[in-house]
Amino acid sequence: MQTNWQPTASIEQLRQRATLIAAIRQFFAERQVMEVDTPAMSHATVTDIHLHTFQTEFVGPGYADGSKLFFMTSPEFHMKRLLAAGSGCIYQINKAFRNEENGRYHNPEFTMLEWYRVGFDHHKLMDEMDDLLQLVLKCGAAQRMTYQQAFIDVLGVCPLEGSMTELKAAASKLGLSDIAEPEEDRDTLLQLLFSVGVENKIGQDVPAFVYDFPASQAALAKINPQDHRVADRFEVYFKGIELANGFHELDNPKEQLARFEQDNAKRIEMGLKPQPIDYHLISALEAGLPDCAGVALGIDRLIMLALGCDHIDQVTAFPFPIA
């Protein structure tokens, strides 16, 4: 049987990919950030209602009934355990797995760059990320705006103070009435508005850093001590593509556990299965996570932009359909 066996990326594009990844490693070596390697599978996983995982079972000696394992959506939990153990500043280039979309900007298995800087807040980490983006993308310095500013400038509605009626009216102007009208979850509505109405309007000429996300979308970030409506979280966009998601990392174990439990309660309300909480991470936070900021960046999307390609298949050898 004849099959489509050849890579979707040209050999020259794969060479350029390798060169860019080498440059990223050099970037961190010059800053004395240590490269680490953590597991691709874990007994626990993310509780985020918007992330869907792959899972398998280990059935080796002593586990005849099977031990459930989850492929990691990010190395974050393991890397924070290293930070709590005294690793200092670290980075990783790894494979991540999400049982979600497959298309122009998505592959179920993808390459991620994640790094953590001890003693940084999210603003200082944005400075460093700006340097990396200028190196790889050969672009100008990034623009910065708050989440609130982006919403008001593009959609004319405040995401922090606007009513659900006002948010649904903004969705209606985007032709999203059928989706927005029955929606009762504020964050789901905000994410819909941001993804459809805002993302493709910012960061067209240079990357855009959007920071101060609503506190309800804090995930693993600290709440801003000056404005409890927002979290110390940022995302990065360029030419309509989300590139990265970063936090001034939450170091309070009780608060982190409460957020995981709230996620699982929400999953049950939505008819989804609750996910096993990573108590190793909670124990690491109890032992003491150093004050730090961290960010995860999609390498495939970054290289796609750097090489002027239209699809991540052009910069990956064997995407999902032919893997």
Swiss-Prot record:
Binding annotation for substrate: S74, P75, E76, Y116, E249
- Offer a single GO CC term for the protein: cytosol
| Listed GO MF terms | acid-ammonia (or amide) ligase activity; ATP binding; lysine-tRNA ligase activity; tRNA binding
Q: Say if the entry is tagged with keyword Nucleotide-binding.
A: yes
InterPro entries reported for this sequence: Aa-tRNA-synt_II, aa-tRNA-synth_II, aa-tRNA-synth_II/BPL/LPL, EpmA
A family per Pfam: tRNA-synt_2
Q: Which GO terms describe its biological process?
A: lysyl-tRNA aminoacylation
Q: Which reaction does it catalyse?
A: D-beta-lysine + L-lysyl-[protein] + ATP = N(6)-((3R)-3,6-diaminohexanoyl)-L-lysyl-[protein] + AMP + diphosphate + H(+)
- Source organism, top-level taxon: Bacteria
Query: Can you tell me which residues bind ATP?
Result: R98, N99, E100, N107, E242, L243, G298
Key words, A-Z: ATP-binding, Ligase, Nucleotide-binding
Q: What is its EC number?
A: 6.3.2.-
Name of the top EC class for this enzyme: ligase
Which PANTHER family did the record assign?
ELONGATION FACTOR P--(R)-BETA-LYSINE LIGASE, LYSYL-TRNA SYNTHETASE
HAMAP family in alphabetical order: EF_P_modif_A (MF_00174)
Q: Which family does it belong to?
A: Belongs to the class-II aminoacyl-tRNA synthetase family. EpmA subfamily.
- Outline the subunit composition: Homodimer.
Function per UniProt: With EpmB is involved in the beta-lysylation step of the post-translational modification of translation elongation factor P (EF-P). Catalyzes the ATP-dependent activation of (R)-beta-lysine produced by EpmB, forming a lysyl-adenylate, from which the beta-lysyl moiety is then transferred to the epsilon-amino group of a conserved specific lysine residue in EF-P.
Q: What is this protein called?
A: Elongation factor P--(R)-beta-lysine ligase
Q: To which species is this protein native?
A: Vibrio parahaemolyticus serotype O3:K6 (strain RIMD 2210633)
